[in-house]
Amino acid sequence: TKVSDEQASPKAISVTDFDSSSWGREWAHVETDADYAAEKTVAEVRNLVGRVIGERWVDKFDFQLRGKADGKDVFEISDTGDGRISVRGNNGVSLASGLNYYLRHWCKVDYNPLFGSQLSMPESLPAVGRKILKYTNYEYRYALNFCTYSYTMAFWNWDDYEPFLDWAAMNGVNLMLDIVGQEEVLRETLTQYGYSDDEVREYLSGPGYYAWFYMQNLYSVGGPLPAAWFEQRVELGRRIHDRMQAYGVTPVIQGFGGQVPADFQEKNPTSVAASSGTWSGFDRPYMIKTYLTDADKAAGKEDYFQKVGDTFYKAQENVFGKVSNYYAVDPFHEGGTIPDGFDIVDIYRTVQRKMLDHDPAAVWVMQQWQWGIDETKLSGLADKGQALVLDLQSDLRSQASPMENQGVPWVWNMLHNFGGRMGLDGVPEVISQDITKAYNSSGYMRGIGITPEAIDNSPIVYELLFDMTWEQDPVDYRSWTQEYAERRYGGTDGTIEKAWDILLDTAYKHTDGEYYQGASESIINARPSDNTIGSASTWGHSDIDYDKRQFEKAAALFEQAYDSYKDSAGFRYDYVDVMRQVLANSFQEYQPLAGQAYKSGDLETFRTLSSRMLDIIKAQDKLLSSSDDFLVGAWIDDARTMLDGADDWTAD
């Protein structure tokens, strides 16, 4: 008997409005009482210390808030004279960043909840010696991509978000995409236009497909969502916002771009809505027309864009309060069809005007990807100064020229870990050099950020990018990497130094013309074939543009260093990842040879090669099973346990 067979029908979906919730009251208290807000910020940073390095160290730091430095975020570190360390900053993010700077450079500690930490503290806190003051030129330090919410974060709960928010604050992040609980905003909107809760649940996609649902590429995939989802995810979203508020991180929440279910016009006959095309074989949502012609008005049509937009923003405030002035929406992400009679310039103007009607301080956050944001679209903006374009892949394929030409603020981003594919990849040299060069030559670059499709490998590039927050000049990435390895592993020696030099010259080396969608993937995961396999997934590839034999030398050095550094979770993670890459590379060499032997009838060679390939698969499985970070079971367990009270069908 199924658990669901024995359960009563789910109760109607009911979510307490924000102002009536404990989160709403707390938010208002912080916003209206500066002294209380300051006390809470310092208290939360002290709590962060306890979570990261242990309670015994909390009172060893003296945190104080100070003003900005010439309008810029800043932190300073100094000795107190009584064995403690003073950290001063203009907000929680600056305080956490100052703490992180001290831990990395004086204690040789590296905190990374995603990729393993090295938290071995000295017996007592080393003295700073002189006051250190660091400021940033970048108004925005942005994090996340819609894809990250599906490829890595689909089933996260508070136990995942809390350490991630700590890490983000310690790395200077002050603007972060946040879609947790946004389904309730859509439910409260659509139920005002003829939709039942069940119909809304059918329209929404499941969390594994949220990326493409919220980017307006598809709908009704991977659902329906259980009724309990809405209240629980709103509660999580409010909890996330509470911590963000204390740190000084601004969430980027959803804006309204006119997207509605395909049957919207049937339910609302005086509206004008049309298909926006397909994406990779999936139907996109329909789009409400942003303006009415005289012919539309003569036919009795009404301006539903204004109506639904008002409802949407009212629902957004009802669910999450006035939590942010930053709104993300991309009406035509990765293509899409502009319906007949719709004007692209008017769409962009009207979408922004509706935001500004609701929130005069609104900033429209858009994604520049595949040249989807062009000068024509930007020319339609009602206020270019209240837009912010994320140039998603500035590290390898910058597309910032439309923003520069139109005078629209933009953010330099690193797009990484395409598709969540497991492969060592990244361009430290580019990150260390090009960010400051771009800023110095730009009139409108306002920040830096990470826009990874997933966050599942190559921690070096994330740490380096956010370290650039506090630098005004390019850095020597090779020296930086050696310091990074020392704190990540709790020490260093010639073996580690040589291993990382090789990694920088192989997997982490920038090559002109490099395949721009990230790391090669392991063809162990591909469907078997007697032809040469080029990828394991639709958008993947298996190109290796470095010397595999050189890379294997780095792996041998990691093996040599294992006993010295195995107590570091950071080292163990990197060890498994490097060895995994060696096995994936080796399998790739055998596969085409085995296919050729099979097709030519050389069964002896085929059996020899296929036996080696099977041995590699077994070795890969044994290696990856040694680390929780590489287990598919962890992903499955997260999916099954993310929702309280889920029946067995939902959990599976």
Q: Model regions: which residues?
A:
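Mature N-terminal, pre-catalytic/accessory segment of carbohydrate-active enzymes
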Residues: 1-186, 310, 354, 568, ...
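Catalytic-core regions of glycoside hydrolase
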Residues: 50, 57-58, 107-127, 133, ...
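Polar/charged low-complexity regulatory segments
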Residues: 543-551, 558, 562-565, 579, ...
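Large, well-folded core regions of big proteins
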Residues: 537, 555-558, 595-596
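Short amphipathic alpha-helical segments and their helix-coil junctions
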Residues: 79-83, 438, 553-570
